[in-house]
Amino acid sequence: MDDEIAALVVDNGSGMCKAGFAGDDAPRAVFPSIVGRPRHQGVMVGMGQKDSYVGDEAQSKRGILTLKYPIEHGIVTNWDDMEKIWHHTFYNELRVAPEEHPVLLTEAPLNPKANREKMTQIMFETFNTPAMYVAIQAVLSLYASGRTTGIVMDSGDGVTHTVPIYEGYALPHAILRLDLAGRDLTDYLMKILTERGYSFTTTAEREIVRDIKEKLCYVALDFEQEMGTAASSSSLEKSYELPDGQVITIGNERFRCPEALFQPSFLGMESCGIHETTFNSIMKCDVDIRKDLYANTVLSGGTTMYPGIADRMQKEITSLAPTTMKIKIIAPPERKYSVWIGGSILASLSTFQQMWISKQEYDESGPSIVHRKCF
């Protein structure tokens, strides 16, 4: 498909927005899902200070702005800011006219019905798109891995979901949600670095800690054993240079931080870890399809990017599942963007073209059309 009539694929995550053209193998634009507003009134007249900034520009001016994330735990909570993010996506990042392209949007599993309707309404009424569709994020990740049946453990910045999918349909009764994801791990790393004597407090410093987390953290196969290794030698220590040139050293924090995914009690949470949540999700499904789910457990999202996470999941789920069960954890290298990639694949299939909600259908039925056509 050429860009002239190509569909646009927009994956709105709690932390990052991924956008591009259907048929491409990676998103063209990836930017933070933030809207920033100046903390103080501009001093100089005629400086042309804007009343809001979006994405990277908001990030780079974060010192003078109040930053807000319109998507919390995967679900849109502030529609005015969300509209600003979409506007920025179309006009500044992709540089396209939305009224000329069909748009595929993604949504969190168990997204409230009113939210899908609001998305649909904004696309047709504010941006005048010719056609649109709303797809569930985890289902797209599964498509991207070349499967139509499996269970997806999707963990991003704001929320983690385990979503069993059979023949392309998510099974809503068995979807589980865990409000523990990348942002919580960043906060936890800030906390345990403070214990080492490094203080990180502001929203700007949180971004530095996020970078440390992404570059140096990993998941231990055996947590207790790794703690022992860290205590008895300095082999696990790594150093990181802060923007001001100061060098800090981190040791057991490297694996203590993501360990919270498996032991949420580290964060003072009573929920099950990601391994147990995945197992519970499988157990909520029909006994006949469990075997297919165990053998097709797909990891997706930025918070599954830690080295060692697939081996640890394999080990933990093996100990929970029936002894003879074949368990396979699939961790595609591109899983950070697999939701977007799945959307790109779906929107460029010839069989999908009749699935779009057209402007005409919307005008006839109103926003509720989305429940009939997108499931």
From Swiss-Prot:
Subcellular location: Cytoplasm, Cytoskeleton; Nucleus
Modified residues (Methionine (R)-sulfoxide): M44, M47
Modified residue annotations for Tele-methylhistidine: H73
PTM comment, free text: Oxidation of Met-44 and Met-47 by MICALs (mical1, mical2 or mical3) to form methionine sulfoxide promotes actin filament depolymerization. Mical1 and mical2 produce the (R)-S-oxide form. The (R)-S-oxide form is reverted by msrb1 and msrb2, which promote actin repolymerization. Methylation at His-73 by SETD3. Methylation stabilizes actin filaments.
Keywords recorded for this protein, A-Z: Acetylation, ATP-binding, Cytoplasm, Cytoskeleton, Hydrolase, Methylation, Nucleotide-binding, Nucleus, Oxidation
Coiled-coil spans in chain: none
SMART domains xrefs: ACTIN
SUPFAM superfamilies: Actin-like ATPase domain
Superkingdom as given in the UniProt entry: Eukaryota
GO function terms (MF aspect): ATP binding; hydrolase activity
Catalytic reaction list: ATP + H2O = ADP + phosphate + H(+)
Transmembrane segments: none
Modification N-acetylaspartate occurs at: D2
Family of this protein: Belongs to the actin family.
Additional record remark: There are three different beta-cytoplasmic actins in Fugu rubripes.
Function: Actin is a highly conserved protein that polymerizes to produce filaments that form cross-linked networks in the cytoplasm of cells. Actin exists in both monomeric (G-actin) and polymeric (F-actin) forms, both forms playing key functions, such as cell motility and contraction. In addition to their role in the cytoplasmic cytoskeleton, G- and F-actin also localize in the nucleus, and regulate gene transcription and motility and repair of damaged DNA.
Protein name in the entry: Actin, cytoplasmic 2
Organism for this UniProt entry: Takifugu rubripes (Japanese pufferfish)
Gene behind the chain: actbb
